[in-house]
Regions:
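N-terminal export and membrane-targeting signals
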Residues: 1-13
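Penicillin-recognizing serine hydrolase domain
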Residues: 27-29, 39-65, 74, 128-282
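Acidic helix-start/capping segments at beta-turn-to-alpha-helix junctions
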Residues: 70-75, 107-129, 274-281
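C-terminal motif of bacterial Sec signal peptides marking the signal peptidase cleavage site
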Residues: 17-21
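Bacterial Sec signal peptide processing site at the extreme N-terminus
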Residues: 24-34
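A mature extracytoplasmic/lumenal domain signature
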Residues: 71, 82, 88-90, 115, ...
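Short, conserved catalytic-motif segment at the N-terminal edge
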Residues: 62-83, 99
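Active-site SXXK
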Residues: 83-103, 111
C-alpha cells in the first residue's frame, strides 16, 4: 500500500515493506461446526454456490480464488484457503489490540481508513510497549474469538491468517467492545480503496494487497462483516493473479465480492444461512 513518508528506522522499514507489499492450491473446505441451526443440506447448498462463484471468478480472471463465510456456529469455505501473507487485513486486530491499551483514535483512522503503514506500525509498537509481545497480544485476541493466526513478530504483513479464520473474526467484530470504533471506521474507507466488499451495502471490510516478486503473483484480500437487521455474517475472500496487475486483481475482487454478498443475502432470506443475532458473553 502507498507509504508517503521516508526516513524510517530499519525495523520500521522492514515492517512497512512487508505490509506495503499490501500475498495454495485451490480446494474446497468446510470448517467443522459442533452445532448449527442450519442443516447439513442447507450448508451443502451454500457450499455449492460458493464453489460456483469461485470457479467463475477463477476462470474469468485466470486466478487462484478463495472465499469463506461464518454465521452462527457454521463456517463454510471454498477454493484457495488463503494461507499466504495476510497483508494489511491484519491491521484490524492490531488496531483493536492497541485500542485496548488506550491508543489514539486518530491513528486508527489512518491505519484503517487509509491503510497508512506508519500509523499501523505505531499502533503495533504501542501494543508491544504495553503487552511486552505484540504478536502474542494480537494472537491472543484472535484466539479469544475462535479465530487463529500465525502472527509474524516483526513483519506483521507476512502473518498467516486463513480465510475461514478471518470470516470467524469478521462475524465477531460487532461483539468486541474494544472493536466498536474499528467497526465504525470500516464503513469510512477512503474512496480509492472502496473495492469489492467495501462497495457492497451493509458490509464493512478491510483490504490488503501485495506482490510476491518471487512467484510473480499479485494478491488482493478482504475480510469483514455483512449485517442485516442486527444479524451478522463474517466474510473473507482472496484473489491471486499473475503478474503485477493491480487493476486486474481489483476487478476480480469486485466480481467475486458481488457474488459472495448475493449468496449471503439469499442464504439468509431462504434460511440456508442462520447468522447470529446476539453476542455471547466472553
Amino acid at each position: 500500500m502507498k507509504n508517503k513518508r521516508l526516513g524510517v528506522s530499519l525495523l520500521e522499514a522492514l515492517t512497512l515493506l512487508t505490509v506495503s507489499a499490501c500475498s495454495g492450491e485451490p480446494g474446497t473446505e468446510s470448517a467443522p461446526a459442533s452445532s448449527t441451526t442450519s442443516s447439513a443440506s442447507d450448508q451443502d447448498l451454500v457450499r455449492t454456490q460458493l464453489d460456483r462463484a469461485v470457479d467463475k471468478t477463477a476462470k474469468k480472471y485466470h486466478a487462484q480464488v478463495g472465499v469463506a463465510i461464518s454465521a452462527g456456529d457454521a463456517t463454510i469455505a471454498a477454493g484457495d484457503k488463503g494461507e499466504g501473507p495476510v497483508w494489511s487485513t491484519i491491521k484490524v486486530p492490531i488496531a483493536i489490540a492497541a485500542l485496548k491499551d488506550g491508543a489514539d483514535k486518530s491513528l486508527v483512522d489512518l491505519a484503517i481508513k487509509e491503510s497508512d503503514n506508519d500509523a499501523a506500525y505505531t499502533l503495533w509498537s504501542q501494543v508491544q510497549w504495553h503487552e511486552g509481545s505484540a504478536d502474542k497480544a494480537v494472537g491472543d485476541l484472535l484466539d479469544a474469538y475462535g479465530s487463529h493466526a500465525d502472527i509474524h513478530d516483526t513483519a506483521f504483513g507476512y502473518s498467516t491468517w486463513p480465510l475461514k479464520d478471518q470470516a470467524v473474526f469478521g462475524a465477531q467484530l460487532p461483539c468486541i467492545e474494544e472493536a466498536d470504533y474499528v467497526h465504525k471506521v470500516l464503513k469510512d474507507i477512503v474512496s480509492w480503496q472502496k473495492v469489492g466488499l467495501s462497495k457492497e451495502k451493509q458490509t464493512r471490510a478491510k483490504s490488503g494487497w501485495g506482490l510476491d516478486e518471487e512467484e510473480n503473483e499479485y494478491t488482493y484480500r478482504q475480510f469483514g462483516v455483512h449485517e442485516v437487521a442486527g444479524k451478522r455474517v463474517g466474510i473473507a475472500l482472496s484473489v491471486v493473479t499473475d503478474g503485477e496487475n493491480y487493476a486486474e486483481a481489483e476487478s476480480a475482487v469486485d466480481y467475486l465480492a458481488h457474488q459472495l454478498v448475493g449468496i449471503v443475502e439469499a442464504g439468509v432470506d431462504e434460511g440456508n444461512i442462520e447468522p447470529a443475532a446476539q453476542c455471547e458473553d466472553r
